[in-house]
Amino acid sequence: MIRAQPLDSVVLIGGCDKTVPALLMGAASANVPAIMLVTGPMLTGDHKGERLGACTDCRRFWARFRAGEIDAQEINAVNAKLAPSAGTCMVMGTASTMACVTEALGMMLPGGACTPAVMSERMRIAEATGARAVAIAKEGLTPDRIMTPDAFENALTMLLAIGGSTNAIVHLAAMAGRLGIEIDLDAFDRMGRETPVLVDLKPTGQHYMEDLEKAGGMVTILRELRPLLKTKALTITGKTLGQNIDAALPGWKQDVVRPFRNPIFRNGGIAVLRGNLAPGG
């Protein structure tokens, strides 16, 4: 569709799981100036004083219902609170993971990954994205200049640091393939041993995406990961990743993103396995 229309640039609007990588794959193939805008996560719900998030808590309560620990009335009450606003799942599932890795990849404006869908800041991000779409058309800033091997390495580093969805590996490999870039699984396996898990979000941790936003969002993670990042990688701003980090406001005390030297886990949660079922990894 991008190739078929007389477009000078395009805003890619996606949300859940496969929509974001699919849009970026199309943008890579067309190689017309493009910028990603995600819809943003939902806000959390609550049940009997406990915060709820889809899909992590829905599975937990459904298991309790099937085990006879709660009745139909209670599971219905939980269901009514699991998705309290518009947006993608508010845990670090595939949607949130792809939003975060896309910002690290450089195809999204800084701060665009974590802001909840219903917040006024999301509208400001959308407006800024549209303005930047006009600018990249004039500059001729195409996806192949941003989605480079260094940018994909940054995205994979972010995937490990956030404890993100394993689906992202498949998506990133498919995106890279559109640009003739191959994800080196052996290198990724080594990265998994070197990259700490810094983000304490469900389903493996305690917090939700709105908490990550309140903790400063992606730049808080990027700042801690800086020793491992390719900071000279070009981004959609027309500046390097390092310049974007330097331009951000200073961080503040919070408990969602751990310091690099005091991580949740010292190694990433994803490893590459090889064997007769998967000889290529």
Label for each model-derived stretch:
Residues 1-5:
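N-terminal small/polar loop signature for handling phosphorylated ligands or for N-terminal nucleophile
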Residues 11, 34-37:
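Short hydrophobic alpha-helical runs that function as membrane-insertion/retention elements
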Residues 16-20, 26-32, 40-281:
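Catalytic or ion-coupling anion/metal-binding cores of large enzyme and transporter domains
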